[in-house]
Regions:
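Cleavable N-terminal signal peptides of Sec/SRP-targeted secreted and luminal proteins
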Residues: 5-21
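Accessory beta-strand-rich segments of carbohydrate-active enzymes
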Residues: 22-33, 46-53, 88-200, 234, ...
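Active-site-adjacent substrate/metal-binding segments within catalytic domains
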Residues: 79-103, 108-125, 131-132, 191, ...
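Structural beta-strand segments of beta-rich domains
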Residues: 110, 221-229
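Extended acidic/polar, glycine-enriched regions
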Residues: 149-154, 230-314
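Short, solvent-exposed loop/linker segments at the N-terminal edge
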Residues: 213-223
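Extracellular glycoside hydrolase catalytic/binding regions
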Residues: 444-448, 459-462
Length: 462
């Protein structure tokens, strides 16, 4: 099949998905019950690109009402291409602006989850500024929207996405040997939190770590997990009273009743939770488990793999990497999210084709260069048994950047980006390595990287 025919198939696949009207996220984690989660993906966005080089994206006097959006855009997609750039390679530097409306349950608070908004992102709901994001254009982040800001119908979301290189608005985008795409390049989710009699506590995420793993004990096969359960509330403050919840593994329909009091950060840490009928994940047998957390009718389902990375000494005295006690040789490729036609917003078919190429090439290891990855890609790596190297945005980071710990400086946003990358990647069995801006954290500031990881995920072992 010729190159043009393949491109046409990819475009038709994307259009079919839009026509099907898929509203819930298809990637993990999954949500159900009273926790209503929909995406704002699709062709319903009004759009324009401001090409004025003097336009100030941080101007506090700017209002969405002052802008006329003169064309349509599909989300997710790259503003570089929407504005007429060469497919997959080049595009304009400017400020993309998006607007659409959505309905919402009356009286409910919402959380907006952006899987990516590149580079600098600023968001309004019904004309009210709800927040911005400077920590890089390839990481997921969320913004809470107060219930008082919302209406029952026709809520307007307005998003500004500035893809210009600028140390103030986009400190993480230092350049590099690839094209930095702009716009709403991945999905946008709306998480609805109706108020209930029990206080409207919802499970936000449940980060899973195999229990009692130690890299120096390579033969250990984990059968239990540690869970860091992050909570969200429709109230203005984090929940602090005892929370009753259930855990159900692999959709068995046998929920375990539990209760715990959240810490000051609104999280509950569970240690050594047994996994029924535990099966190990490996590169040759990528078996996955699920755990569903339910609080007052709102359910969150996370997918994870039981695996243990270790190091053991071979007969010749060399240290060898192991998974579940077995020596494994990793062979792989660097992988960029940069396709013709779709650029950094690939279709599912394009991702499937790349997984097939990796498998055909005998790869069991892939490096995600040079930025945090799309959740759909991480799901596919989990299922294919391909190990992943995940890194924050790089690689053109200078030593002076890593020495900037000032308020609002480079390292403040680098630590935020690392946390957000971990939030999105932590449960994926394929993830073996998390790296900060290429290799500089290992060479210069490994202690700061280690602190960042432990601060955000205290159950992790190093």
């Amino acid at each position: 099949m010729g190159h043009q025919h393949l491109i046409m198939l990819f475009m038709l696949s994307s259009l079919f998905s839009l026509a099907a009207g898929i509203q819930s996220p298809t990637y993990w984690p999954h949500f159900s019950g009273d926790r209503i989660v929909t995406t704002l993906d699709g062709p319903s966005w009004d759009y324009t690109m401001n090409m004025d080089p003097h336009f100030d994206s941080m101007d506090p006097s700017f209002t969405p009402a002052s802008v006329a959006l003169d064309r349509k855009a599909t989300v997710p997609s790259c503003s570089d291409l929407v504005h007429g750039g060469a497919s997959g390679y080049l595009g304009p530097r400017g400020v993309a602006m998006y607007r659409r409306t959505f309905d919402h349950a009356a009286g409910a608070k919402i959380r907006l989850q952006f899987q990516s908004c590149s580079f600098y992102c600023k968001v309004w709901i019904n004309g009210h500024l709800v927040g911005d994001h400077k920590a890089g254009g390839y990481v997921p982040f969320w913004l809470d929207v107060p219930a008082a800001t919302m209406k029952a119908k026709d809520n307007e979301i307005f998003v500004l996405a500035d893809n210009r290189f600028n140390a103030t608005t986009a400190p993480m985008h230092t350049g590099g040997d690839f094209w930095h795409y702009g716009g709403l390049i991945r999905s946008v989710e709306v998480h609805s939190m109706p108020t209930t009699a029990s206080g409207a506590v919802y499970p936000w995420r449940a980060w899973v770590m195999p229990s009692a793993t130690n890299i120096h004990q390579p033969f250990r096969a984990p059968t239990a997990i540690d869970i860091t359960l992050a909570l969200m509330s429709s109230a203005s403050s984090s929940p602090t009273t005892t929370v009753k919840f259930t855990l159900d593994f692999d959709g068995a329909g046998s929920p375990q009743k539990m209760s715990a009091t959240p810490n000051a950060n609104g999280t509950i840490i569970l240690k050594n939770v047994p996994v029924p009928n535990p099966m190990l994940w490996s590169t040759t047998s990528p078996t996955m488990h699920t755990v569903t957390v339910t609080i007052d009718g709102a359910s969150l389902s996370e997918r994870f793999g039981l695996r243990h990375w270790g190091v053991k000494t071979d007969t010749d005295g060399a240290s060898r990497l192991t998974i579940n006690g077995e020596i494994v040789k990793l062979v792989g490729w660097n992988h960029h999210t940069q396709w013709p036609v779709t650029a950094a917003s690939p279709t599912d078919a394009q991702m499937d084709a790349d997984i097939l190429l990796l498998k055909q090439g005998g790869a069991n290891y892939v490096r995600g260069a040079h930025y945090p990855q799309d959740p759909r890609w991480l799901d596919r790596l989990d299922e294919a048994g391909i190990v992943m190297w995940s890194e924050t945005l790089g690689p053109d980071v200078k030593l002076k950047n890593t020495q900037d710990f000032s308020k609002g400086g480079f390292m403040e946003y680098q630590m935020q980006q690392m946390q957000e990358m971990l939030d999105g990647a932590f449960n994926h069995a394929s993830i073996m390595t998390c790296v900060e801006f290429f290799l500089l954290c290992v060479l210069h500031y490994s202690n700061d990287c280690d602190w960042c990881i432990r601060e955000h995920h205290p159950d992790i072992e190093s």
